[in-house]
Each structure stands twice: as structure tokens, then as C-alpha cells.
Amino acid sequence: EYSQQNNRGKFATEILSIIKDSDRENSLGKLKEYRLNKHFDYKADEYILQTVTSSFTMKDLVCTQDVREEFEYFIKERQQTEALVQMDIPVSNKILLHGPSGCGKTLSAYVLAGELSRPLIIVNLGTIISSRLGETSKNLTQIFKTAVQEKAIVLLDEFDSLGKIRDYDQDHGEMKRVVNTILQLFDFVSQDTIIIAATNQLQMIDEALIRRFDLSIKMDLPNS
């Protein structure tokens, strides 16, 4: 049985954890607030946890060699995007990061933003359980359009929230519309825009969403 109170409590705990991680990383002076040229109304702000520029590099990331090689290849590919596009070679721009909490998914987004010198917009999909569920599609569309204009990296945190709520009877129709909106937005963004989704519950995500990603990277805890 779905318990809204329990989910809110879990959600609050996860947000506090993200904020603590962010504070720790900010204390290193490697993140700076980035002011967006917003093309959305104030309600869409509720979905955004951070907009930053980063000076994190691959040297800051603790991960397995396989994961490191995947990130390094992606970075090199993105650095040569213009040449690849001229040769009609498709360029990866959508990454799904999955693994347990604390394995470095958010830090990985900071690293990619730093290596590629892109602003990073962190979007909190967990807020779709809010009372304004009906406005989710519109707000996400506004944020994505802003990301395209800013040539930003978008991190969709708590990506499994889409799957968690889709399976419950309440608001089923609206959640289906939100999932369809995400699918359409994935197709809408140009190759200049990079989308990263993070989840610790891969099994909760719709297969149609998973198939939209160019890369799916499994991340483990540093000591595993």
C-alpha cells in the first residue's frame, strides 16, 4: 500500500543527503552558482535543486576502471562533437547512471560538467509527488527548453520516481502523461544538450525510458 507520508519522509532524507554532499563539494570551492537566463515561471523552480558551474575533473572521481573508461570516452566524444556531426556520426548525449546511494552519481555529473565546461542544472524529479502533479509536464518542458538554450547539462535526479508513482492507481493518467513528456523531451533536445539521469532503483524505470539512453553506466560504492 502506498503511503504518501512514508514517501515524503524518505524523500526528505534523500534531499538532505544531497544537500550535505553538495555542501561538502562546495567547501572545496569547485562549484559556483550559475544564474540561468530563465524561460520558465517560478513554479518550475521547485524542480531545480542546483544550477552550477563546476571545476571538478576526472581526477576527483573514485570509480572502477571500466566506469572511468566509459566517462573518458564520452568526454572525448563530446569534445569532438562538431567534427563528428559534420561526418554524420551520431554523438551520445543521454546517460543513465544507476547504483546505490553514495556511489558517486551526482559527483559524476559535476565531473562531466567540469570537464566539458558546461553549466549543470540538477532537476529533482521526486517533486512530482507534490500537490501540483498536473503541472509537471509543463514545468519540465520549460526547464528542458532553457537547458537547450543554455547548452547545459541536465541531471534528472531520483529518475525512478517516474516508475514508482506510475504503478499506483492514483494519478495514473497524469503520470503516464509525464512519462510521455519525458520521452518527447528526450527526442526534442539537440545533441548540444546533455541529459544525465540518476537512479538507485533501475528496476522501477520504464523500459521505454531506458531505451532512450545512449549509455547506461552501473556505478558501485568505492569500497565494493
Give each language-model segment a name.
Residues 2-57:
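Interdomain "pre-motor" coupling segment immediately N-terminal to P-loop NTPase/helicase cores
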Residues 47, 51-56, 60, 76-81, ...:
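Flexible nucleotide-interacting loop at or near the entrance of a catalytic core
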Residues 66-70, 76-224:
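Walker A/P-loop NTP-binding motif of AAA+ ATPase domains
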